[in-house]
Every structure is written in C-alpha cells, then in structure tokens.
Amino acid sequence: MTASPTPGRRPHLDRITWITYLQLSLFAFFLYGFGATQALLRDEQGTSRTIASLHAIVFAAANVVAGLLIPRLMERWGRGRVIRYAVIVMSLGIAVYTAPFGLPASLIGTALVSCGGVSLVATANAFILDYQGSAGPAALTQANALAALFGFLVPLIIGLTTALAWGWRTGLWALIVALLVTELLRSRQPHTPRLQLAQGPRPQHPTTAGCSGHDHSPMPRRFWWSLGVVGLLLATEFTLTLWSADLLRERAGLGPAAAAASLAAVTGGMFLGRIVGSRLAQRWRVDRLLV
C-alpha cells in the first residue's frame, strides 16, 4: 500500500482505514457512555441536575476551544502526531473522569476527553477524506455507522456492569486499553503513506478533499446553511443522549441500570440511520443527501 486508493464511489477498506474507523468508534463509545453515566455520577456525587449539567457545558466549551486549535496543530505537527496526542489526552481524561475524587476531577476529566476526542475526530475525518478521494463521503458515513454501533453497545454494557455490581466505570476503563492498543497498531503500519497520515501533500488544486493547502476566500452561503443543519442535529443528539436516562428514571420509574441501558434505543436508531446513509452516500450527491 504505497498510494491512495483509486478514486471511486466505494471506499477502499484496507487496514489503516479500519484502524481509523475503530478509533472514531472508540470516541463514540465514550461519547454515548458519557450520557449514560451522567445520572449515575450525579447519584454518586450527590449533586443537583443543575450542577451535573456542568459536565455537558464543559464538554461543549472544550470542543470549541480544541476545534479552533486543530487546524494549526495539524499544520505544525501533522495528522499522525495529532492523533497520537489526542489518544493520550483522551485516555488521561477518561482516567480522571472515572476517578472517585468528586466533581472537580470529573469536570477536568470531561474537558480533557473533549479536547482529545474532537482532535481525534477532526484529524481522522480529514485523513479519511484525503485517503479515500471521491469515496470519502461514503467512507465517513461508514465510519459513523460503526461508531453508532459502538454507541448502541455502550449503554447496554454500562447497564449490565451496573446491574452486576461491577460499577459503571468498568467499560470506560476497558476503553482506555482499547484506545492505546489501536494507536499502537496504527503507529506500526509500515506501508501507510506517511505524508497522508502525518500531513497531506500540498496539492496543486485547493479544492481537493482533505488537502493541507488553505483557501482563505469566504465560505459559500451553502456551507453556512449546511453547518446550521448539522448544528441543530447535533443539539438534538446531545440532548437525547445526555438526558434520556435521567428522564426515564423520573417519568418511567426505571432503575439506574435499566435507564442507562435504555439509551441503546436512541443509539440503535442512529446506527440504523447511518447504515442506510452509507448506502445512499454511494449513490447520491452529498448536498442532496443532507436535504
């Protein structure tokens, strides 16, 4: 494997692509596990819903800060190093988040995971688009489908470990190991084009997907409409994942373990939608699919 896959509508599923998919899915594992654990963490810390919601605020704020820094970090360090540092920061954040040291520690851990996670997602997405060429949109949808599958499993795992008295932290501790193992596997890929893993080659045409060149012209109006739609979808998704378990405990009388596991209904729907979306992305234009 010495060059990018031949451009086409169907993604080229080689080893580095699968590793990248898996790394994105591991972040999704935490993301949806984060929502499932919020009510459990609030019970443990004895805080109100208002105080517990600080975790969501910190997560969002850290996302914004990291998102502003990522382009410069990719320019300076390259994609490979950004992914490596992101995995390290995320693993450290999970360890701090799950440490029984009270609210300050869980907030700090949340910020670290958010910074590492958004850095991992942005950099891995840029790599996939660059590496897969015209199959990039379909590849991203495939990656999101696999991530949704992990998101479907994590509430069930957290609910099961809570019911078995193993504690909700067990699944997140296993996630740390999985993150480090996948990064070790990625770093040991001898035939991966280093320029594409580190910093994409500067193309002659700035319109190439995932390129490292910069076009400082204003974004078209269609971009801002698309960004607005994605923002609304993300707001809906985070509202469901963060508060569904707590709402089911209050309104439906579910126990902590059952409420955490029930979040799988939300993430399972996302998984089915992304499976269908990955097929449609191979046949329809991206703007039509978004509509």
State the predicted function of each range.
Residues 119-132:
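Intracellular juxtamembrane helix-capping segments at the cytosolic ends
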Residues 105-119:
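Hydrophobic core of transmembrane alpha-helices in multi-pass small-molecule transporters
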Residues 32, 59-68, 152, 267-271, ...:
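Residue-level signature of mid-helix packing/kink "hotspots" within the transmembrane helices
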Residues 134-135, 142-191:
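Helix-loop-helix hairpin linking two adjacent transmembrane segments in secondary transporters
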Residues 65-104:
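Conserved MFS/SLC helix-loop-helix module at the cytosolic interface between two early adjacent transmembrane helices
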Residues 10-37, 111, 220-236:
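Pair of pore-lining "gating" transmembrane helices in MFS-fold secondary transporters
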Residues 46, 78, 99-104, 133, ...:
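Helix-breaking motifs and short loop linkers at transmembrane-helix boundaries and internal kinks
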Residues 34-35, 221-264, 271:
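Extracytoplasmic gate region of multi-pass secondary transporters
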